[in-house]
């Protein structure tokens, strides 16, 4: 849900001069933020997972439509996904009209690796190798894709756990990996804002 960590991230992007939107993908079931102690509710509202991810595509399409109404929007948006929403980093550029995708500690990404076929926009995927939602075989599969697709960049950090981006994640939170992830995201956004070299190659 859209908790303080996500609102703070949106504010951080805004402080760099970017338009930021954080849609609540769970508004149809159990809306709003949940605490990390609400494990049962968190699981319940995201199931059945494939169906919920598919339904959320409409929310991302609607979000992009709203952005296009803004005078300051240049027509290029990136989708950034964490945990449950990691797959949108692929789905967004694949078929929803987004110009780039970034996933930080995405979950169940093995179900969406085939969606990368035909994607030419920049996709950046970042994990820790101690992420319980990204087993070694998933990391290896994405390594293979990144090795053959120049628009896909993959970063895997040793000892980093799931939810490393989120200060509320307790011991899993990692400042340095978060800083790296933000730096890479801002670099991609800068390309989208100015039509940088990577964007021209992907067009």
Give residue spans per PLM region:
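N-terminal cap/leader regions of alpha/beta-hydrolase-fold enzymes
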Residues: 1-203
